[in-house]
From Swiss-Prot:
It comes from the Eukaryota. This is ATP synthase subunit delta, mitochondrial. The gene is atp16. Keywords: ATP synthesis, CF(1), Hydrogen ion transport, Ion transport, Membrane, Mitochondrion, Mitochondrion inner membrane, Transit peptide, Transport. The keyword Magnesium does not apply. F-type ATPases have 2 components, CF(1) - the catalytic core - and CF(0) - the membrane proton channel. CF(1) has five subunits: alpha(3), beta(3), gamma(1), delta(1), epsilon(1). CF(0) has three main subunits: a, b and c. PANTHER family: ATP SYNTHASE DELTA/EPSILON CHAIN, ATP SYNTHASE SUBUNIT DELTA, MITOCHONDRIAL. CDD domains: F1-ATPase_delta. GO terms for cellular component: matrix side of mitochondrial inner membrane; mitochondrion; proton-transporting ATP synthase complex. It is found in: Mitochondrion; Mitochondrion inner membrane. Mitochondrial membrane ATP synthase (F(1)F(0) ATP synthase or Complex V) produces ATP from ADP in the presence of a proton gradient across the membrane which is generated by electron transport complexes of the respiratory chain. F-type ATPases consist of two structural domains, F(1) - containing the extramembraneous catalytic core, and F(0) - containing the membrane proton channel, linked together by a central stalk and a peripheral stalk. During catalysis, ATP turnover in the catalytic domain of F(1) is coupled via a rotary mechanism of the central stalk subunits to proton translocation. One of its GO terms (molecular function) is proton-transporting ATP synthase activity, rotational mechanism.
Length: 167
């Protein structure tokens, strides 16, 4: 793949018939049609939480660190780690969701798309139950069964993020 991209960079245009042009390709001189506000779409495999809703800000737990996304944010794709997504609507009301991971894509048109396997309102969690589960799975990490220990390590990682978010 890299050889193809390097070849394309050296050539002034694509060789005839080598690559079919993708949909929506644009040149540097063409402007992108932008929304006036940040527009959020957030979906799970079984439910859409937001569908093209104008918002003020979205805070995400990216693998590279916590990020606040506002209107006119640079286009990017981020892998999300377990943590809290905070959505600030136009009335400055905040909604917080705990996610187990996922992806966020910021388009040049001010559209932010978030896809996650699981998302739950933060207020639906019990801090005491989360702490109890964390202690239980920390103990399971010392299991002699590698499978049990590996599953416990994943659960501990997610539960530690949840316990931090609930404080």
């Amino acid at each position: 793949m890299f050889r193809l991209s390097n070849y394309m960079l050296r050539k002034s245009q694509f060789p005839q018939g080598l690559v079919r042009a993708p949909f929506g390709i644009r040149g540097y001189a063409q402007a992108v049609q932008k929304n006036e506000k940040l527009v959020l779409s957030m979906a799970l495999p079984y439910q859409t939480i937001y569908e093209k809703v104008p918002v003020t800000q979205v805070d995400i737990p990216a693998e590279d660190g916590e990020m606040g996304i506002l209107k006119d944010h640079v286009p990017m794709i981020q892998c999300l780690k377990p943590g809290v997504i905070s959505v600030t609507d136009e009335s400055s009301n905040k909604s917080k969701y705990f996610i187990s991971g996922g992806f966020a894509v910021q388009q040049p048109s001010n559209e932010l798309s978030i896809t996650v396997p699981e998302a739950y309102k933060l207020e639906d969690f019990s801090s005491s139950v989360a702490n109890q589960l964390l202690e239980k799975h920390k103990a399971e990490m010392n299991s002699s069964d590698e499978g049990v220990a590996a599953e416990a390590a994943v659960r501990v990682s997610v539960l530690e993020s949840l316990v931090r978010a609930l404080k």
